[in-house]
């Protein structure tokens, strides 16, 4: 028994060390999941960015089309592609900056779709209809990717903020990550009618 008492502090220290290592490794896994889901978000936004030049070129073929609307779409795309975020540093501020740029693209595309209602020939163009369908599908993929990202961030943040795990997180340099938030006015459903 005397022998056991002599090793008891070492046993307790070993158990604490193993617990800390397990917690650290779990946090690394959750951090990697956040990075993976972020890559999915970026990939879907990139797909949307890749569709925009084709959409703009299709619309440009209609001489009377409002040039200002096309210019705003191109400018919003350029601004959004200039905002790059390091996935290991997804702070709430940087994520808000990224989201603001992407919301600018969404807004410009929304205005473009509204203006296109005035051009029945354009709405009958098969290339335009294909691009429109691809864009709608991409917007859905973006929505799903953002939801999965937010879920991964919630799991990660819960893992690093709870006590006593927060001690391991502090020692390991794990920091809280930001969520995607809904855009201003997102609580009101937009009116979209491509059938006219």
Regions found by a protein language model. Give the residues of each.
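A helix-centric hydrophobic-segment signal that preferentially recognizes long
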Residues: 1-196
């Amino acid at each position: 028994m005397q022998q056991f008492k002599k090793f008891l502090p070492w046993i307790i220290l070993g158990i604490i060390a193993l617990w800390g290592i397990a917690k650290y490794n779990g946090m690394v896994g959750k951090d990697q999941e956040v990075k993976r889901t972020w890559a999915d978000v970026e990939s879907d936004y990139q797909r949307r960015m890749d569709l925009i030049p084709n959409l703009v070129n299709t619309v440009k073929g209609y001489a009377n089309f409002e040039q200002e609307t096309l210019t705003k779409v191109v400018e919003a795309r350029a601004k959004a592609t200039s905002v790059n975020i390091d996935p290991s540093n997804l702070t709430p501020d940087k994520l808000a900056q990224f989201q603001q740029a992407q919301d600018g693209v969404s807004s410009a595309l929304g205005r473009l779709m509204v203006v296109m209602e005035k051009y029945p020939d354009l709405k009958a163009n098969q290339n335009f209809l294909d691009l429109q369908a691809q864009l709608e599908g991409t917007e859905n993929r973006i929505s799903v990717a953002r939801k999965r990202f937010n879920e991964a961030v919630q799991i990660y943040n819960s893992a690093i903020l709870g006590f006593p795990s927060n001690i391991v997180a502090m020692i390991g340099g794990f920091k809280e990550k930001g969520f995607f938030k809904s855009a201003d006015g997102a609580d009101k459903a937009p009116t979209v009618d491509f059938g006219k």
